[in-house]
Amino acid sequence: MNIIITGANGYIGRYVVKELLNKGHKVIAILFDGESPHSFLSGAELFYGDIFALSQEKKVDLVQNAECLLHLAWQAGFNHRDPSHLNNVMKHYQFLTSMAELGIKNISVAGTMHEVGYFVGPIDANTPCNPRNPYGIAKNFLRQAMFDFASVTPELNLRWLRFYYITGDDRFNNSIFTKILKAEDEVQEYFPLNSGEMLYDFVDIKDLSLQIEERIISKESGIFNCCSGKPKSLRTAVEEFIAEHNLKIKPKYNVFPARSYDSMAVWGAK
């Protein structure tokens, strides 16, 4: 399958590109002008440009012979209150709908558990959404808008891939584990945390890439979890990470309160 990937050079994108190439797919990886491709993109066709500012001519060139679009691009995903989420959401929508109008009939879009908002228990495709921060609000709007567009575009096969907490290659994922490694490098004795009692869904980046590949080549439309399906406490995840990496730093709990929009137990249903 010939697959266009936005955000191809990002933390998730580079692993997905590698997985798709290993499975024999042709990948068209979109990068910003002047961006240096990660080594995992070796073998992919590189397409340079800002997806929010592509001319019609460049869009036509992009979709030639392509069968599928995987939209991973998103700015400031780890800063849930960044103004870019709401400022850019219509640009994402306009890009995606323009791709469909140019003939791409299989579109998969990265979603997030933060669309759901405060919720306790397993999340599935029918879980009500009431997002509590700009990141979740923007992603939730994009999901609703895209499925509305799909409802009047019957030839479009739309898949919404809902991501959870991603681990692996932790030097580069900007997660709590990245911060633990940075604190270890700085020879800090303790790493401050909240209670650590919350249960989350942690999925390794390599497993996530496999799940994404399976979904984007399927013929199903709808909302799909890309997750482990297993709740694990933050405390357990942190202590396992420290032990596995032979770190000297120690977790210090109850330094920070939990975020107002974080539930005590939330994970993806599989």
Curated annotation (Swiss-Prot):
Gene Ontology BP annotations: O antigen biosynthetic process
Binding site for NAD(+): 11-12, 50-51, 72-76, 87, 112, 135, 139
EC number from the UniProt entry: 1.1.1.339
Coiled-coil segments: none
Active-site residue list: 135
Keywords, sorted A to Z: Lipopolysaccharide biosynthesis, NAD, Oxidoreductase
Superkingdom classification of source: Bacteria
Binding site for substrate: 112, 135
Record organism: Aggregatibacter actinomycetemcomitans (Actinobacillus actinomycetemcomitans)
Name the record gives this protein: dTDP-6-deoxy-L-talose 4-dehydrogenase (NAD(+))
GO molecular-function term, one example from the UniProt record: oxidoreductase activity
InterPro entries found in the cross-reference section: Epimerase_deHydtase, NAD(P)-bd_dom_sf
UniProt similarity note: Belongs to the NAD(P)-dependent epimerase/dehydratase family.
Gene3D superfamilies: NAD(P)-binding Rossmann-like Domain
Catalytic activity: dTDP-6-deoxy-beta-L-talose + NAD(+) = dTDP-4-dehydro-beta-L-rhamnose + NADH + H(+)
Purpose: Catalyzes the reduction of dTDP-6-deoxy-L-lyxo-4-hexulose to dTDP-6-deoxy-L-talose.
Pathway per the UniProt entry: Bacterial outer membrane biogenesis; LPS O-antigen biosynthesis
Annotated signal sequence range: none
